[in-house]
Each structure stands twice: as C-alpha cells, then as structure tokens.
Amino acid sequence: MLIYKYIYGPVNSWRLGRSLGIDPISSKRKACTFDCIYCQVGKAKSCSLKRRVFVPTEKLIKELSSIPKLNIDYITFSGTGEPTLAKNLGSMIKEIRKFRKEKIAVLTNATLLGRKDVQRELKHADLVEAKLDAPSNDLLQIINKPHKSISVKKIVDSIKMFKKDFKGKLALQVMFTKDNIAYAEEIAKIIKSIKPDEVHLNTPTRPCGIKPASKEEIDKITHHFKSLRVVSVYDKRKRKKTKPISRKETLRRRGKA
C-alpha cells in the first residue's frame, strides 16, 4: 500500500468540483503568514513571511506520478499553511503541467501576492483564489491574526497588482463568522474595487471550534455582492462522488474527508 505524504483527497469541493490536494508545505506544524481563528489545521507557532523549500519538487512529482488513475477537475495547492511560502511553488506547477492535463488552482491568503517572484510563479496556474475576511486592520487582527507587517491595504493592493498581469481566473473568498458578517457591505465594496472573476462566500463548516454562519445569514448578505458572480458554500449543486486515496492525510489537512 502506497503512503502519501504530500497529496490528499480527492475531495468534493463546492468551488472546484473533484479536487486533488497538493500540500507544498507538508510540515507537522502549520507554516503561514496568518493564524486564522477558523483554521482547521490548528494554531501556528509563529507567523513568517520567509519563503523556503519545504518539499523538494522531485519528491512531490514522484508521489504524484504514482497515484492511481482518478477522475478529477482540479489539482489544488493548499494544505498545512500558506502555499506561496513554498519557494519552489512555481517549479512544482510547471513540472505537473508536463504530465497532467487537469486545471491547477492555488488557494492563497494573498499576503505575498505583491511579490514579483510569487506573481511569476502563480501565472502558471489556471485559478488563484485569494482571501479577504476583513475590511479593517482591527478585524484583520481578530480574525486572521497576521504577521505584524501585514495590513488590509497591503493585501488589497497586492491582489490588485497581481490581477493586472494574471491571465487565469481570479476568485476571492470571504470566510464569514460572527465577527465579520455585520461588515459584509464594507467587504463587498472593497471586493468590487478589485473586480475578481468570482466571489466565494464561505463559512467554517469543517471542525475548528468556530460556529458557522447559517444559510439564512449568508443568503441575507449575498445582495451586497449582486454585481459580481457569486458562489456560496450553501448553494445547492450536485456534488460529485469521490474517495480519498489517503483518508489520514485528507483528515489532517481538512478536518474531514
């Protein structure tokens, strides 16, 4: 039986369909620029902006090459931290392109999108989903607990800068909790200034100790985003059946399989 260290899923994603996860961090401790209150991976020992190689590209490619034939829609970079902290993220994407035909997505908190090296690497992805949970620095501290150098303005400016040259699909996710749902209109105003291709309205549905917003609460605030293409975690769409190749690794990164 093969043991997978860097790959998890595939899972049924309400955003991406059948999604096979790639974790370019794959460390026992979360490595992130945020320490979000709703993160199912757990708490970060500290937040860092330093990029480094966590998983050698050749090891990831060897593991990906060994998986059985799967019917998937996306290969998605996400997992035990912020994917753009992986210094070899670009080489991973390019090597995967050589032998896989599926679309590639990267889920990022957007804190490093202002960096030219990160922009160059992400241009090879089909979809980049950035995150914006707070319209103010006070809320950013409460919800995302970022590295001390990060501000809402820096995040928004970084996303706008990235969008200028990105040829793929840019989505923005908002994770709504009791702390920010009253600020939906303010968040929507900022997102409209960014003009993403799609907005994903989310709430913590995985085990994390934070109570999710109800379907009624999410439906109630959706009108603030009416000029944008919106997808909600509560949208009724037929989910495609999937079975993870490694239940253990999937549970470790997602809290559920």
Cite the ranges covered by each PLM segment.
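Glycine/small-residue-rich loop that forms an oxyanion/phosphate-binding "nest" at active or ligand-binding sites
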Residues: 72, 77-79, 96, 105
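Short hydrophobic-acidic sequence motifs that mark active-site Asp/Glu residues
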Residues: 19-21, 74, 129, 171
